């Protein structure tokens, strides 16, 4: 078993921000490792542009080894199979065991797949991004009609990015499109989707797949052979057996200090964590990075921790697939190429800020 003073499990947005800060200033004392499934971290905000061909794969990812080297952190490649929260031991899929005096979890979430009967329909999830790209390359060789599940920002952006690449596209969401965002943003998104020929079905939750049919309740609502999942985040199965306290949906319950409610020596951020007033979004994970960095440093040095104050509102920018973007802020919305340039600048800046030479 390999032991560390601190293990950063997962190369999510918050952990990238922590590593960047430690590369620029002094990091906490002790042996620190970053555990990641692969040598790169993908920036999900650029996925629609990547799928639509506006970005190359190299534009959308951060090489982890240079960043870890600059932060004086060991890069450990491996996938988590189990976690014992009481002992803070991570069991990896290849049999290795890692133990941390402190742990920080930024491991994202999986995607909920509707129960499927038969194998007539191919199902592809929007994450992990590497598998999405592999599957999408195969689908591109023979374009067919397709459905997308997910009426959030990710589903809308993917629908607009793919509208010109498939013969017919349908977008299904269980509630209202872009629920919780500015009403004007929803109307603008609906207009763009309809203009691009996307069939939008609101308040149409998909409960199961039977052969090549999508069913809402007992009603068949769409027939085809390709389904892209862009909604329905679910915790990784190993979290349920970890002894960590969780919310009703199974996500890790955390305190304002970003510590797990049940285990103070384990921090959790991003999509895997649940805090009152915090929505699961990459934008919020980025904003957790400064507090997480400060609190990990304080924890290793025995100092008091800071509280993270979750934001109820944030700027929403949705790529429209043609170089433009839709913007939403509180009850105000706008759209156009100017906002697309602004979104591109923000996305490219994020990737550039976390790239280190060498």
Task: Locate each region found by the language model.
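Rossmann-like NAD(P)H-binding beta-loop-alpha module
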Residues: 134-168, 172
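FAD-binding core/adjacent interface of flavoenzyme oxidoreductases
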Residues: 2-3, 70-145, 228-230
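C-terminal auxiliary extensions adjacent to catalytic cores
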Residues: 322-358
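FAD-site-proximal beta/loop scaffold in flavoenzymes
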Residues: 120-143, 222-226, 230-290, 294
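Internal hydrophobic alpha-helix adjacent to the cofactor/substrate pocket in enzyme cavities
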Residues: 19, 284-311, 317
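Beta1-alpha1 glycine-rich phosphate/pyrophosphate-binding loop at the start
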Residues: 2-73, 157-183
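Conserved N-terminal Rossmann-fold NAD(P)-binding element of oxidoreductases
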Residues: 9-11, 105, 149-150
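A Rossmann-like FAD-binding core segment of flavoenzymes
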Residues: 75-82, 98, 166-256
């Amino acid at each position: 078993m390999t032991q560390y003073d601190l293990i950063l499990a997962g190369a999510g947005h918050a952990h990238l921000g922590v590593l960047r800060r430690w590369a620029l200033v002094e990091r906490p004392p002790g042996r620190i490792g970053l555990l990641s499934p692969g040598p790169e971290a993908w920036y999900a905000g650029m996925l629609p542009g990547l799928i639509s061909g506006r970005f190359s794969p190299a534009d959308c990812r951060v090489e982890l080894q240079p960043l870890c080297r600059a932060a004086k952190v060991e890069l450990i490649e491996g996938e988590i199979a189990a976690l014992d929260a009481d002992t803070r031991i991570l069991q990896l899929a290849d049999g290795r065991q890692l133990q941390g005096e402190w742990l920080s979890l930024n491991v994202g979430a999986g995607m909920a797949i509707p129960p499927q009967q038969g194998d007539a329909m191919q199902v592809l999830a929007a994450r992990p991004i590497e598998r999405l790209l592999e599957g999408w390359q195969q689908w591109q060789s023979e374009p067919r009609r397709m459905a997308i599940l997910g009426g959030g920002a990710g589903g809308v952006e993917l629908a607009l990015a793919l509208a010109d690449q498939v013969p017919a596209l349908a977008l299904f969401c269980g509630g209202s499109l872009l629920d919780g965002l500015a009403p004007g943003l929803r109307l603008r998104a609906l207009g763009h989707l309809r203009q691009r020929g996307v069939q939008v079905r609101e308040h149409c939750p998909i409960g199961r797949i039977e052969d090549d049919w999508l069913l809402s309740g007992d009603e068949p609502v769409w027939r085809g052979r390709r389904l892209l999942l862009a909604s329905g985040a679910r915790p990784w199965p190993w979290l349920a057996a970890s002894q960590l306290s969780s919310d009703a949906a199974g996500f890790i319950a955390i305190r304002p200090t970003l510590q797990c409610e049940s285990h103070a020596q384990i921090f959790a951020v991003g999509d895997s964590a649940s805090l009152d007033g915090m929505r699961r979004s990459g934008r919020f994970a980025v904003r957790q990075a400064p507090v997480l960095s400060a609190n990990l440093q304080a924890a290793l040095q025995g100092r008091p921790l800071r509280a993270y104050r979750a934001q109820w509102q944030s700027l929403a920018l949705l790529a429209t697939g043609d170089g433009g973007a839709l913007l939403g802020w509180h009850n105000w919305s706008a759209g156009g190429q100017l906002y697309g340039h602004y979104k591109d600048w923000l996305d490219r800046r994020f990737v550039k800020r976390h790239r280190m030479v060498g």
